[in-house]
Swiss-Prot record:
Annotated localization: Cell membrane
GO terms under biological process: polysaccharide biosynthetic process
Annotated metabolic or biological route of this protein: Glycan metabolism; exopolysaccharide biosynthesis
Keywords (A to Z) from UniProt: Cell membrane, Exopolysaccharide synthesis, Membrane, Plasmid, Transmembrane, Transmembrane helix
Name of the protein: Exopolysaccharide production protein ExoQ
Pfam families, A to Z: Wzy_C
Transmembrane segments: 11-31, 35-55, 65-85, 117-137, 156-176, 178-198, 203-223, 230-250, 325-345, 361-381
Length: 435
């Protein structure tokens, strides 16, 4: 049987290849530190050769991506004033090529293939961690936690969060049945187990918040587009007031206490303070992309020692915005935040304006997860990370024009509601039709 090369780059027609490529990409993102450069080359080999099949279709119009590449280009430019220019050059090029791969995936992968690939990839990553993982002692809070095959429980927790979210999206948004419904259920249970064993409060709280938000948006989008915005605004105002009331009532300390944390977030607030002080050294353009946490630099060495980081690597300020302003200054912070905010609110706008759009529903949840985690992690700031891959995938989808469909009923009279991602074909008789 001959398979057309064009089917490799046609969304929906390349499902098998797309699932394989996404699953292997996630494995590389998770464990490239273990398997080295060979795994990175395999990642490039999955996406870059697709350009040779049909470069116009795969690359699209890069003029529409200028706002997406703005931070990436600026990160590369920081080599001219970087405290570690060779490191900034290497990591800047890596980040740029990583963004290109994410945009190629965006052009060639549809939302159902993305969801299935993420489920498969998360399951493989978590199974590997269960088979070859270890426990880690945290000297700051005096506890042991399962970190899997990662260096941090928060990374294990992030992949578990993705497994839970995409399993939820597969069943409740895309309406998967049969084999993939079972796969989503199994992957979701595996991810939930890993999330609990990791004891990552960040991942547990953000996962619960995003799932709750998506359920709320699922209810809002059951209305016609004209009514959604008013209900969303009302719900947002109510949620904001409730959040403020909870903070003043001590609800935050109560929640943190349930996870064995205090108001310092296990030293995060001290790290944030140190990051803000470091940003004052070069507030406009920063010290250079990836040029702060460098062995031999006094401030980095001091913080590694204070937080018992014996490897003297893989550490950060646990806040995307602070990390960005330290490395790339206010200019870089604005450019990166522009991509993150546009990805989140752009998908939200589509969700509130269009009829039953499963792609926007799934990507809105992805944007929400990355946006919330940005305040406590740096998932989108480094190359070969699943967070940055998903960010640019989500942002890139906004550059593809949408075909406006005629307004339809939510579901025909006398029939059960369809899953969120399913639509009714034209053969369904209209009410009163005699055929």
């Amino acid at each position: 049987m001959r398979i057309s090369k064009a089917s490799l780059v046609r969304p929906g027609a390349n499902e098998v290849y797309g699932i394989f490529a996404l699953a292997l990409s996630l494995f590389v993102f998770a464990y490239s530190a273990r398997f080295g450069q060979v795994s990175i080359l395999a990642y490039y080999g999955l996406w870059l050769p697709l350009v040779l099949v049909d470069y116009r279709k795969v690359l699209g119009n890069y003029a529409s991506y200028l706002w997406i590449f703005a931070f990436t280009i600026f990160a590369c430019i920081t080599i001219f004033w970087s405290a570690a220019p060779s490191l900034s050059l290497r990591t800047g090029i890596q980040y740029l090529s990583h963004v290109v791969c994410a945009l190629i995936a965006m052009r060639t992968i549809d939302i159902r293939t993305l969801t299935r690939g993420m489920i498969a990839g998360a399951a493989i990553v978590l199974l590997y961690s269960l088979l070859f993982g270890t426990y880690h002692y945290d000297p700051l809070d005096g506890t042991y936690s399962f970190v899997g095959a990662f260096a941090s429980k928060n990374q294990l927790g992030f992949y578990a969060s993705l497994g839970i979210y995409f399993a939820f999206a597969a069943v409740f948004v895309l309406g998967e049945k049969g084999l993939w419904m079972g796969a989503a259920g199994g992957a979701g249970l595996l991810a939930a187990y890993c999330l609990l064993t990791s004891q990552s409060a960040t991942s547990v709280l953000t996962t619960a918040a995003v799932i709750g938000l998506c359920l709320g948006m699922r209810a809002i989008t059951a209305l016609r587009p004209a009514s959604r915005k008013l209900l969303f605004i009302a719900a947002s105002v109510f949620g904001g007031v409730a959040a403020v009331a909870m903070i003043y009532a001590g609800g935050v300390d109560l929640i943190l206490g349930a996870f064995g944390k205090d108001s310092t977030l296990t030293g995060r607030t001290y790290l944030w303070q140190q990051g803000i002080e470091a940003a004052k050294v070069s507030p406009l353009v920063g010290v250079g992309y990836q040029a702060y946490w460098v062995q031999g630099f006094s401030e980095a060495e001091r913080l590694w020692e204070e937080f018992y980081i014996g490897s003297r690597a893989g550490f950060h300020f646990h806040n995307t915005f602070i990390e960005a302003v330290v490395e790339t200054g206010l200019i870089g912070l604005i450019l990166l935040t522009m991509v993150l905010v546009t990805a989140f609110f752009g998908q939200l706008k589509r969700l509130l304006s269009e009829d039953r759009d499963p792609e926007s529903m799934v990507l809105f949840g992805v944007g929400a997860l990355l946006f919330v985690r940005a305040f406590v992690e740096i998932d989108i700031l480094t190359p070969y990370h699943v967070g940055s891959f998903l960010l640019y995938f989500t942002a890139g989808k906004l550059t593809i024009p949408r075909r406006r469909r005629a307004a339809t009923l939510l579901w025909p009279a006398g029939l059960d509601p369809a899953p969120y991602g399913r639509t009714f074909g034209p053969m369904i008789p209209r009410p009163g039709d005699s055929r």
